[in-house]
């Protein structure tokens, strides 16, 4: 299980509980998150996270990823399909897929994330984190978030823009190489009905390319669906996982 940015492996506990009778699960902390060391920039962030995930795999595995974790799971499946029995992508923020089908989105999203990047560059991490979470957070106003959560978001906000080339520009060639189109792993795509409009376009773009991919939408949920609506996510995952034997 690969969690989203600005969280930690424990964020997947609710979803894990809903699948505990079906799977034996392992979750790890992304670089710069939880108990993992800081990301030092020597290796691209997504590449480093894929390599971390690979260290846990010794055979075909049911891979589950949320948000940035979903992009990691997708890349791993494309690189090592022999190690993936099934793939569950919950709101994978692989913007490059949406840009490929909707070129105008690149400029729109670039302007939005440009404001975040500009704030980071100016040393204003609070503004950067506030702007980012306004679109991609749990729906709470910045001022209403617990102080500890706001502080952690400010500490980690640079990791959001650090992955830009891999998830936005497809610098690893996951899409442009045709690896996504060749993927034959059973795949389930999950989105929240109230998520940013990019998510539906990303999921649709990926589902169109991955043979046999199944798409599900969770009513009343936003981008944090894997956390906020864990029982509902588990409920749609269970028949998919059962079908894998």
PLM features per residue range, with description:
Residues 1-38, 59:
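Conserved HGGG/HGGXW glycine-rich cap/lid loop of the alpha/beta-hydrolase fold
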Residues 78, 83-120:
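Flexible "cap/lid" loop of the alpha/beta hydrolase fold
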Residues 2-4, 66, 191:
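The conserved beta1-alpha1 loop
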Residues 65, 69, 73:
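Gly/Ala-rich beta-loop-alpha elbow adjacent to hydrolase catalytic centers
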Residues 218-234:
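Catalytic histidine-centered segment of alpha/beta-hydrolase-like enzymes
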Residues 122-162:
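Conserved alpha/beta-hydrolase catalytic His-Asp/Glu region
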Residues 47-62:
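Conserved acidic catalytic loop of the alpha/beta-hydrolase fold
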Residues 152-208, 217:
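Conserved serine/cysteine hydrolase catalytic core
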């Amino acid at each position: 299980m690969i969690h989203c940015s600005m969280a930690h492996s424990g964020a997947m506990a609710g979803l894990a509980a809903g699948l505990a009778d079906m799977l034996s699960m392992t979750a790890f902390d992304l670089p710069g998150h939880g108990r993992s060391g800081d990301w030092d920039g020597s290796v691209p962030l997504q590449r480093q996270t894929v390599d971390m995930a690979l260290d846990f795999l010794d055979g075909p595995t049911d891979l589950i990823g949320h948000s940035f974790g979903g992009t990691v799971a997708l890349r791993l499946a494309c690189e090592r399909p022999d190690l993936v029995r099934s793939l569950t992508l919950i709101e994978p923020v692989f913007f490059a897929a949406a840009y490929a089908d909707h070129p105008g989105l690149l400029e729109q999203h670039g302007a939005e994330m440009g404001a975040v990047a500009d704030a980071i560059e100016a040393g204003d991490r609070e503004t950067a984190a506030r702007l980012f979470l306004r679109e991609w957070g749990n729906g709470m106003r910045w001022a209403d978030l617990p102080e500890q959560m706001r502080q952690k978001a400010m500490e980690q906000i640079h990791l959001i823009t650090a992955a830009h080339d891999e998830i936005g520009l497809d610098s690893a060639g996951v899409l442009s190489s045709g690896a996504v189109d060749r993927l034959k792993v059973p795949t389930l795509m999950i989105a929240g009905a109230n998520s940013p409009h990019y998510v539906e376009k990303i999921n649709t773009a990926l589902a169109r390319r991955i043979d046999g991919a199944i798409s599900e939408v969770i009513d009343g949920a936003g981008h944090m669906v894997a956390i906020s609506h864990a029982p509902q996510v588990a409920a749609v995952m269970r028949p998919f996982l059962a079908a894998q034997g």
